[in-house]
Swiss-Prot record:
InterPro entries: NS1-Nuc (IPR014835), P-loop_NTPase (IPR027417), Parvovirus_NS1_helicase (IPR001257), PV_NS1-NUC (IPR049901). Keywords: ATP-binding, DNA replication, DNA-binding, Host nucleus, Nucleotide-binding. Residues 1-210 form the PV NS1-Nuc domain. This is Protein U94. The gene is U94. It is found in: Host nucleus. The keyword DNA-binding applies. GO terms for cellular component: host cell nucleus. It comes from Human herpesvirus 6B (strain Z29). Pfam families: Parvo_NS1, Rep_N.
Length: 490
């Protein structure tokens, strides 16, 4: 329904934009005399768009949102035909409430069109809207269709660059700021691209990060520092440890930090501290089993998977919930054993999606692949392979003990304690020959054997399915004393 800007386009493009503002009626019949009842058929049975803040207090009503989408079509059709632009114009739009009156703000790329002609085009746009949208009835609203000028009273046409959106409009926080910019996802991608360009240039210059927290330009240092610390707390509370996750969650706060001096370094610093804070103060379970919506457990794919593999879902859920909560003592590992296609990897991947700090270890344990797993909340040991040389370290790791592994004479890495998921096609106890070693593994592992391949039409397990299942299991926990193998229902 909306055109988009190509995410690969340079954010600092030479494209310039004009800004049109269209005021809407508070009372349609009173402020647009002569409007027919048929006119409102355009607005019936229209689904609510999936935009941000649509249901917040003060958001534009659906009638105005629908009117905006139709007016945008009329304006762009005129613009692309009458101005003879070589390609369809790039644009951004936003509907909002200003002082109780609905409003539409539209940025349209000039694409070489002389600014001196904008007044003429705006007059013609008014006429086209009256004819093609308002069915020939002119709104009785002062200055209902205007374009931005350099002065409040008069002046030339004000021209904007695309950076005006994130660096000015998105910085405004007000109750009526609703229905954020229509191409917000693409804008986030473009902002991410600038960020990557900035980070290269700034790291080449090796800036002094202290300038960002304690600027010399008169900025309130204490206020800026407290805001930065508040941002770190917000990131860690939500489990945000990557730039992509930050942009998806709140592009506005990301851009606010990016626009500061050396903001890209600040972003990296905030994410780095957020990771350390999460690792020091949170458990994996803190990011799971928080559900505020109703659901039917029998339709949950995790519940269905355990039933398919002949496990008691309550027992399985109890084990997983308490294991993620560090409440099973030395039993720090769950193993999902089974052939390809049995659902073990799909289940594990969905668990990890909920947890911001996680690692995946492939195959055997060695010094080359340890450094990346020093600060994780959950470790997935995929296709686990146990060798005799490192068995004591493996035993400690599976048992939830902190281990310090030497990398070289001057360096080491600390791993754990963190819950571990081990997946394999064979029972991990078959990888060792000593009965002592088998006993050690039995004391540290809950073993789920998946012996059935899931059907092709089996639903894909999503991260929310894990949340629902563990939330359900948390309220039905049972006492369980299991040596190694989780029993199946006969």
């Amino acid at each position: 329904m909306f055109s988009i800007i190509n995410p690969s386009d340079d954010f600092w493009t030479k494209d310039k934009y004009i800004m049109l503002t269209i005021k809407g009626p508070v009372e349609w019949e009173a402020e647009i005399p002569g409007i027919s009842t048929d006119f409102f058929c355009k607005f019936s049975n229209v689904p609510v768009p999936h935009f941000r803040d649509m249901h917040s207090p003060g958001a534009p009503d659906i009638k105005w949102i629908t009117a905006c989408t139709k007016m945008i079509d009329v304006i762009l059709n005129y613009w692309n035909n009458k101005t003879a632009v070589p390609t369809p114009a790039k644009w951004y739009a936003q509907a909002e409430n200003k002082a109780g009156r609905p409003s539409l703000t539209l940025l349209i790329a000039l694409d070489g069109i002389p600014t001196a002609t904008i007044g003429k085009h705006t007059t013609e746009i008014r006429g086209v809207l009256i004819k093609d949208f308002f069915d020939g009835n002119a709104p009785k609203i002062d200055d209902w269709c205007t374009y931005a000028k350099t002065k409040k009273n008069g002046g030339g046409t004000q021209v904007f660059s695309l950076s005006y959106i994130p660096f000015a409009l998105l910085q405004i926080i007000r109750p009526q700021f609703q229905w954020a910019w229509t191409n917000i996802n693409e804008l986030g991608d473009v902002c991410d691209e600038i960020h990557r360009k900035h980070i290269i240039s700034h790291f080449n210059k090796k800036p002094n990060v202290k300038l960002m927290l304690f600027p010399k330009d008169g900025t309130n240092r204490i206020s800026l520092k407290s805001k930065f610390l508040g941002t770190i707390e917000w990131l860690s509370d939500l489990g945000i440890v990557t730039e992509d996750a930050w942009i998806r969650r709140d592009v506005r706060s990301y851009m606010q930090l990016l626009t500061l001096t050396h903001g890209d370094v600040l972003i990296h610093r905030a994410l780095s501290i957020s990771k350390k804070r999460i690792r020091a103060t949170r458990k994996a379970i803190d990011f799971i089993a928080h559900i505020d919506t109703d659901f039917e457990i029998y339709e949950n794919p995790v519940y269905q998977l355990f039933c398919l593999q002949s496990f008691d879902p309550i027992l399985a859920g109890t084990i997983l919930y308490q294991w993620l909560s560090h409440r099973r003592g030395k039993k720090n590992t769950v193993s999902f054993i089974g052939p390809p296609g049995c659902g073990k990897s799909m289940l594990t991947g969905a668990i990890l999606e909920n947890i911001p700090l996680h690692g995946i270890l492939h195959g055997s344990l060695n010094t080359k692949n340890l450094r990346a797993y020093g600060q994780v909340l959950v470790l997935w040991w995929k296709d686990i392979s146990i060798n005799f040389e490192n068995f004591n370290i493996i035993k400690s790791l599976l048992g939830g003990q902190k281990i310090i592994f030497p990398i070289n004479e001057n360096d080491h890495v600390q791993i754990g304690p963190c819950p571990i998921i081990a997946t394999s096609c064979v029972d991990i106890r078959s990888m060792v020959h000593s009965n002592i070693h088998k006993i050690n593994l039995s004391q540290r592992v809950y073993n789920f054997t998946f012996d059935k391949v899931i059907p092709r039409n089996f639903p894909v397990i999503q991260k929310d399915d894990i949340n629902q299942f563990l939330f359900w299991a948390r309220n039905r926990s049972i006492n369980c004393f299991i040596d190694y193998t989780v029993p199946k229902i006969l």
